[in-house]
């Protein structure tokens, strides 16, 4: 097996450009097959969003926590193919067995078959899975990114024990956050004394779980921009030992996420047509407008995913001749990611990409596009070919090992 450093096969920026269009083409083709209303399957937005979300979370377990075990010594592309197949099998097992049939025994809102039996909307079980994944996108990788794998490392644990220990630690925090931030929403939907109802109504102006989406998605973006285009800045300025460094980083990231979500709420009316808000309020009241604000804040955050991931992994944090680890490059890439996210947002909504390219028939009128665009689904789907290539295929065939 080649052991030299990876280098872009065609140099930069050509390797980055080629990989960008390849990932886009793969995502677009598979979207047409599985999600586009004009395609053969038409799973939009559910259950498509549930499967794609769980694919990413299971991928985090496989790559970030288990270190590709037990396939780490298999050559490419065989390793990537095997890990992709394993991912799909695990996704089915986690959803259909762990959630629907095990956890669903105690929590009926997680039980697809239980909801079906009592003639309740089965989509709520799929929403419950998506919400778990949303929480897990932060609580599982945060131990690696902000805590340097504390408390599992440093230790003499090797794989798979180390990975399973990290999964257990992440699951502990995921279940706590899920109980506090997600379960009350289902208490509002399925009212009764067993589950508390949404406690954040006064804070967010809505009982909907989209209040959580609105700021939690920004926390995920901040978390993952850290090891990518930020190259661990600004957290590298925090010099206290673990776990204090991780705790401080989490607090700052959450405060920053809340601030960005509130900022989005304030500025969204600057470009979203007033008719959009009128239609929402006429349909379900003022709280529906607030729900939209929080959801659209999360959707705005979603447009940052592809820019910072591809800039780091396939453009090698290119910084126009600047020191890639310097502060000037940090600000250059941050501004660049913001600009690319804004451009992608404009193409999706004003260029109506969601309608003509993705088949969302709710986007024919401008006033309907923002409330029904479901851009977060596309942006998470778009990153899967990139993540699979980086995580499972280790950038094959776009990168080669130096001799």
Describe each model-derived feature in a short phrase.
Residues 14, 20-28, 55-58, 88, ...:
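Long, compositionally biased low-complexity segments enriched in polar/charged residues
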Residues 207-212, 225-232, 248, 252-255, ...:
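Long, charge-rich C-terminal accessory regions
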Residues 26-30, 34, 61-66, 90-94, ...:
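Alpha-helical membrane-inserting segments
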Residues 47-62, 131-139, 214-227, 293-313, ...:
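Generic alpha-helical transmembrane segments
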Residues 8-22, 75-93, 158-177, 242-260, ...:
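Transmembrane alpha-helical segments of multi-pass membrane proteins
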Residues 1-62, 132-134, 380:
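N-terminal signal-anchor module of multipass membrane proteins
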Residues 30-52, 71-77, 97-131, 180-216, ...:
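Membrane-helix interface and helix-disruption motif detector
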Residues 1-10, 58-82, 138-165, 191, ...:
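Cytoplasmic membrane-interface regions of multi-pass membrane proteins
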